[in-house]
């Protein structure tokens, strides 16, 4: 590791390998490359100082270099301790962009790196956040509340909160008043994922959101593509790389049937598994049933299934009492953002055997064992390399457009949570059609008049559900 320079990566010598993969990824990310072509000359993000907290993968490297091409200064960390691709981080660091990300970093390092992405070498402040899961945003807002005298740091609810609060206290001591200054300097945040969006809506509901936010997750070209088609490819990839298990014929349980659950169930079904689904929502449960999946309660299948995957964004979905009853060598993993969907903390007093990085065998007193992937964190990124470049291009193009919106239009957005307008959603989709050889049908003037829309779109009302 290098501590002298303004980056922390596992091995800077991996930069050449990372650059080769970045070059390949660019050919699969037409949305981002179109943004460079459209906005590269005008540089709408000139003056933007973006703090980025998002999985430091090859695809994210293409996003980072797109933001730079559009004029932004950037400091970056991963939003997950296992999701960094070390060669990607090295390539970005070698290009002169400060990045603080190491695959397998500790939680203490994770929160130190989150602090570092706000610490500009000239002592300046970030004016934009690009977030995934909301940790960077939460770090600043919690610190500012502590500076205001609120008692928000005295009762940590987990080991991670203990470490987070310690890092906030460290910064409070080193730089009194810094959190409030940093909060007030922010023009806005764009948020990538369901979990982070929930946090933002909760803040807005309580009147605690101090700047505008764009909910990238609920752009159609994110949630219906990244969440669904991305998981459809990357879930099984992660399980295979971790375990080499034959999935055909196995019984797999997917907890949750939202967009991520739909993609995950399709992924396992495509690999030949017999898939069952658990759900709390009657609409999603009906969708699962009509898609051909048996909808069950976890308690009814916990002792007979072979693979368990959580996709919900909720906590305590798979609990210690469930895992205790699982068959020997059942595989347990999560593809939701945080690690609390599975009660991993309750397993710590059992016998752990590390098989290889991010694959652990845990033995219960009665002798049955489970295989836990990525310690309950995102297995598609911890055990594999995440979603393919093409689908991430759609998500990240939304991020770029969101950053441009908030940075270039100060005052036009209130301190609320917004979704990008329909015409931009359609633009993102359009940018990805040529790569797939798609030819759109065009409306005639009479047809457009008949249904009351412009020939150029938007083609659907805001309330339309895709």
From Swiss-Prot:
It catalyses: S-adenosyl-L-homocysteine + H2O = L-homocysteine + adenosine. It comes from Agrobacterium fabrum (strain C58 / ATCC 33970). The keyword Hydrolase applies. May play a key role in the regulation of the intracellular concentration of adenosylhomocysteine. It is found in: Cytoplasm. Its main location: cytoplasm. PROSITE patterns: ADOHCYASE_1, ADOHCYASE_2. Binds 1 NAD(+) per subunit. The keyword Cytoplasm applies. This is Adenosylhomocysteinase.
């Amino acid at each position: 590791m290098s501590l002298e320079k303004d980056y922390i990566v596992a091995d800077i010598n991996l930069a050449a390998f990372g650059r080769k993969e970045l070059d390949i990824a660019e050919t699969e990310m037409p949305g981002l490359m179109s943004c460079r072509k459209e906005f590269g000359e005008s540089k709408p993000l000139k003056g933007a100082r973006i703090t980025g907290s998002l999985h430091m993968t090859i695809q994210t490297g293409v996003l980072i270099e797109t933001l730079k091409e559009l004029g932004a200064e950037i400091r970056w960390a991963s939003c997950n301790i296992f999701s960094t691709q070390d060669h990607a981080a090295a390539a970005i660091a070698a290009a002169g962009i400060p990045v603080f990300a190491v695959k397998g970093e500790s939680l203490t390092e994770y929160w130190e790196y989150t602090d570092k992405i706000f610490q500009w070498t000239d002592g300046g402040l970030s004016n934009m956040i690009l977030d995934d899961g909301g940790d960077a945003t939460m770090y600043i807002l919690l610190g500012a509340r502590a500076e205001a005298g609120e008692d928000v740091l005295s009762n940590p609810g987990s080991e991670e909160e203990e470490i987070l609060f310690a890092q906030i206290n460290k910064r409070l001591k080193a730089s009194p008043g810094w959190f409030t200054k940093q909060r007030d300097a922010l023009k806005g945040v764009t948020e990538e994922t369901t979990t982070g969006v929930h946090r933002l809506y909760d803040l807005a509901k309580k009147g605690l959101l101090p700047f505008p936010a764009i909910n990238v997750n609920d752009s159609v070209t994110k949630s219906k593509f990244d969440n669904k088609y991305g998981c459809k490819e990357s879930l099984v990839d992660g399980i295979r790389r971790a375990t080499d298990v034959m999935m055909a014929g196995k019984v797999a349980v997917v907890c949750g049937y939202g967009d991520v659950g739909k993609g995950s169930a399709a992924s396992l079904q495509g690999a030949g598994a017999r898939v069952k689904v658990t759900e709390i929502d009657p609409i999603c449960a009906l969708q699962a049933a009509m898609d051909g999946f048996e909808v069950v309660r976890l308690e009814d299948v916990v002792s007979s299934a072979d693979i368990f995957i959580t996709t919900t964004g909720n906590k305590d979905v798979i609990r210690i009492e469930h895992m205790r009853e699982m068959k020997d060598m059942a595989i347990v993993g999560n593809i939701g953002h945080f690690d609390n969907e599975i009660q991993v903390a309750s397993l710590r007093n059992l016998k752990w055997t590390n098989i290889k990085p991010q694959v652990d065998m845990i033995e219960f007193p009665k002798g049955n064992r489970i295989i836990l992937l990525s310690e309950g964190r995102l297995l598609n990124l911890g055990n594999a390399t995440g979603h393919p470049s093409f689908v991430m291009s759609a998500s990240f193009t939304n991020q770029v457009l969101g950053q441009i919106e908030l940075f270039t239009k100060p005052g036009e957005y209130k301190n609320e949570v917004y979704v990008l307008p329909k015409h931009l959603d359609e633009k993102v989709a359009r940018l990805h059609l040529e790569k797939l050889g798609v030819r759109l049908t065009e409306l005639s003037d009479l047809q457009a008049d008949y249904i009351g829309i412009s020939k150029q779109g938007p083609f659907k009302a805001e309330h339309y559900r895709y």
